[in-house]
Amino acid sequence: MTDDQDVHLNSLDFQPISLLSFEGVAPYGPSCAQHKCHRCGPVLIDPGTCVYNNASMVLDNGAWAFHPGSYSTDLVANRSVEFLGDAIKAGEPFFLGVTPIAPHAETVGDAFEAPVPAKRHENLFLDVKVPRSPSFNAGAAGAVGYFRNLPKLAHDQIDYMDTFYRRRLQSLQAVDDLIEDIMAKLESHPDVLANTYLFYTSDNGYHIGQHRLPPGKTCGIEEDVNIPFIARGPGIAAGHVGRFPTSHTDLVPTIFELAGIPLRDEFDGEPMPLKGQRQSNDALNRNTYKTLRVDTDDYAFMYTVWCTNEHELYDMKMNNLYGSNSTTSSFDIPQLSARLDTLLLTLKACKGIACRRPWQTLFPTGNVNGLVDAMDPLHDSFFLVSQPRVTFTTCSLGYNAEVEGPLSPVIFGAADETAIEPRQ
């Protein structure tokens, strides 16, 4: 798992080894529910977590160790291959999570700087620039919140962003080397590789200059919420591109299912349909940080409530670059907004089944299973009158439940209008 890797800025195009390593597919092998984490560590720890050439680590709860002059991603690669070798020798099922910091920004104290590549990669891609997509350095009609007042980027700012982008690509080359080392170890044990699932992903997306934003990751735009996710292993079709929406709440349920481990009721997510028998099922999208995405073959919407209590509604079939705050859908906009607001309220503090099946949580009678069902005029009063709205009393620097307004919706048909229990 990389740190803050984009999809829409094309960083994967500069990682041929990572892409090639996930081209193939291993045959089916027996599953085993007794998987173990072979060892614990090393773990990158502050103050050197995001320092590329003086990382601070702890191994198996031992003493802290600094590694001046050693490149962080290479340290992670060497330890990972060592752990993998130990796990293979043990002859037992294992789980290995590998999390280099690239392409995260270099962070020393409060300073936020461009990523630092390994010396061997620092002269690559010198002519590459941030992709000049239609949203680059462009405002958006109808934008709200701080997007509304962002000034046009100056030439020196754009030059800095191009340099920042190149440094991200350069730092990812050591990740490619890491993947190559891990694959070489697995390929030297074909029987292990044939029964091992591999995943490549990131924790966040990233933007650089889109909508006039400086480098960052905390917005609800496509660049931030879409991330790489590549899977390889028994039963996963080679070269297949899945179009179903998922989130990282689905990762653990997916791993459990592939390993033959029973799922837990408290899981917020559900297994991804990575194999053919699941890919025919509809998958529900969940996004619970005040931005909601509903995505199907027939319609796709993004609905956002800002801490200023301003609202955005985008028809993503019409414009997936957020060029205007509007929709051309046949749905009535006020009625649609009311449904989406209630769905967002259901998800903003959900847990367990409420995260996986929000419509069924709202309508336990089972007569509403999606947005089209919810748009029935018979439910107008329920959505427009009975429901509280997603609101904020003020803008906070972080999550503060006291300013979040209502945390859960009213359930349809509940005599006492009892709301679902929110996550604490």
Curated annotation (Swiss-Prot):
Keywords on record: Calcium, Hydrolase, Metal-binding
Protein name per UniProt: Sulfatase ppz1
Cofactor: Ca(2+)
Note on how the cofactor is bound: Binds 1 Ca(2+) ion per subunit.
Residues reported to bind Ca(2+): 13, 203-204
GN (gene name): ppz1
Enzyme class, broadest EC rank: hydrolase
Pfam families reported for this sequence: Sulfatase
Function recorded in the entry: Sulfatase; part of the gene cluster that mediates the biosynthesis of pyrrolopyrazines, secondary metabolites showing insecticidal activity. The role of ppz1 within the pathway has still to be determined. The single multifunctional NRPS ppzA is sufficient to produce peramine via condensation of 1-pyrroline-5-carboxylate and arginine, N-methylation of the alpha-amino group of arginine and reduction of the thioester and the cyclization to form an iminium ion resulting in release from the peptide synthetase.
EC number assigned by the record: 3.1.6.-
This protein's record includes keyword Repeat: no
Recorded family membership: Belongs to the sulfatase family.
CDD domains per UniProt: G6S
UniProt xrefs under InterPro entries: Alkaline_phosphatase_core_sf (IPR017850), Sulfatase_N (IPR000917)
